[in-house]
Structures are given as structure tokens and as C-alpha cells.
A protein has these predicted regions:
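Single conserved hydrophobic/aromatic residue that forms the stacking wall/gate
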Residues: 264-275
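Peri-functional-center coupling elements
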Residues: 126
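Metallocofactor- and cofactor-centric catalytic cores in central/energy metabolism, strongly enriched
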Residues: 2-121, 129-131, 135-158, 165-169, ...
Length: 275
């Protein structure tokens, strides 16, 4: 069972129509070069977003590429409505980051982007729309700095994706779907987490049903290899292997609509599990 999300990053450059689009595009290319060199793969969306029509096209491109996390990159000031709508419609974890100014030389008109100011407007517009996006503590940087910030977004995105598709399966004194007597779980629901409480007696019954399971010997061998010289209680390994298989089969049978699972046991001082 694969129990951790795989993050597939996409990056979309945005550009305000009174600034050169080529500036935002060339800066995005540099950021992606730095990211791929130091951290891994990232999908470069070919469409630069200037307006809502561009936003819809870019959204289709990142979805077609199966991206589940998105970087909105302000190569210049950026169109605050279109870029924040992109974050709203994407549906997954989104990060905003912006380009620092570079030496302009003789091309001040073409090489100045004011992305710092654009990031201020973007953050305000995100708040107005009640959009939760990841913004680094200092979200403006050179290509290598932006690449580093994007790499720090990956574990954040992984956590968000995991929570959105997580089910917590617990074992305690009450049967399944008897949540009226449970501890407060609203905040878990608010994060998109699903809860399924099961009776520990049902777990014990399932454990007994796994007695003599032909897979136990292979699990025991794996445990012995992992423990090595630390294997001081070899006699208990078959029962632990039986319990491990019980939990794995339970998880597979009960994951339902969710991709990721967490198994917990609700402890009560007055009860003992005979496993």
C-alpha cells in the first residue's frame, strides 16, 4: 500500500499586460532551470497568464499534465485577478512566488518587472477571495532563491494532498459509525479528513480469523531480518505478524473513497485487548 502522496509540481508564469510578457517567460525559464538542476522535475506551463482566457488555458494545461500542486510565478507585476482565480480554480495546493529585479543595463523599460509590488497585490487579493495559498516568508528572489523556495513548498503540498485524501481508522469501545458518542472531531472534518471508528472486538475477531494465514511466515522472516541481533523475543513474532496482516487487510478493506490511511487505537484504562 502506497500511503504517501506523490507531488507533481507545475509552474505558471503570470504577466501584467502593461509589462513585457517575454520578461515573465524568460524569468520562469531560469527558475525552472535552477529547480531541475538542484531539486527535481517541474512541469513548465507554456501559457503565460495575462487575462482570464489565458488562465483557463493554463489551467487546462496543468490539469492535462496531471499536476497536483501549482506554483504561480510573478515574473513581473502580474494580473492580480487572473492569477488568484487560477489558484481558486486549480483546487490543489498553490504557492505564490515572485522575481527579484535584476541588473537592467541599458534596457530599463524591458527588464523591470515590479514583481515585488505585484506580490503585495496578489496577497491582498487572495485574502479578499478567501483563498489559502502558500506564500514564503520572503517570497521574492533570484532564480536560484525561488527554486529553493519552491523546493520548500513540496512537503507542504504533500501534507495538504495527504490530508485531503486521509482516513483515520480507529479502534475503541464503540462500533462503526457511532460518532454521536465520540470526542470532538469537527476540526478534522474541517481539514477534509474522514474518520471511521471500529470496535476493538471486531478487530480481535479479525485477528483470530487470520490465524494460520499462509503469509505469516514471510512476515516473520522480514521481521527477523530487520531485528537482526536485536531479536530477543522470537516467540512473539508470529503473533505480531498475524496482527500486522490483520491491520493491513483491514486498511485495504476499509479505505473506501480515500487514498491514505492512519490507524490508531483508542486507549481506555479499564479495557485490555487480548491480542
Amino acid at each position: 500500500m502506497k500511503n504517501i502522496p506523490e507531488v507533481k509540481l507545475g509552474i505558471v508564469a503570470v504577466s501584467r499586460d502593461c509589462f513585457p510578457m517575454s520578461l515573465s517567460e524568460s524569468r520562469r525559464i531560469k527558475v525552472c532551470q535552477e529547480y531541475k538542476k538542484a531539486y527535481g522535475d517541474i512541469y513548465e506551463c507554456p501559457t503565460v497568464v495575462e487575462n482570464e482566457n489565458d488562465m483557463l488555458k493554463a489551467l487546462d494545461e496543468v490539469n492535462t499534465a496531471d499536476c497536483n500542486a501549482l506554483v504561480v510565478y510573478l515574473g513581473n507585476f502580474g494580473p492580480e485577478s487572473s492569477e488568484t482565480l487560477l489558484a481558486k480554480k486549480f483546487g490543489g495546493p498553490v504557492m505564490f512566488v515572485a522575481a527579484a529585479e535584476e541588473p537592467c543595463g541599458d534596457a530599463l523599460i524591458d527588464n523591470r518587472g515590479d514583481a515585488y509590488c505585484g506580490m503585495l497585490n496578489a496577497s491582498y487579493n487572495l485574502a479578499l477571495r478567501n483563498i489559502k495559498a502558500y506564500i514564503p516568508e520572503y517570497p521574492v528572489g533570484t532564480p536560484d532563491e525561488c527554486a529553493k523556495m519552491i523546493s520548500e513548498f513540496v512537503p507542504v503540498a504533500r501534507a495538504i494532498l495527504g490530508l485531503k485524501d486521509l482516513k483515520i481508522i480507529s479502534f475503541g469501545p464503540r462500533p462503526q459509525d457511532f460518532l454521536a458518542c465520540n470526542a470532538p472531531i469537527r476540526q478534522l472534518y474541517n481539514m477534509g479528513i474522514e474518520i471511521e471508528e471500529n470496535s476493538e472486538l471486531d478487530l480481535f475477531e479479525s485477528f483470530n480469523a487470520h490465524a494460520g494465514d499462509e503469509r505469516i511466515s514471510a512476515v516473520v522472516a522480514d521481521m527477523e531480518a530487520e531485528l537482526g541481533k536485536g531479536n530477543k523475543m522470537a516467540g512473539i513474532l508470529p503473533r505480531l505478524a498475524q496482527y500486522e496482516l490483520t491491520l493491513l487487510d483491514w486498511a485495504e478493506a476499509h479505505k473506501g473513497s480515500r487514498k491514505y490511511l492512519s490507524l490508531i487505537h483508542i486507549s481506555e484504562p479499564t479495557r485490555r485487548t487480548p491480542i
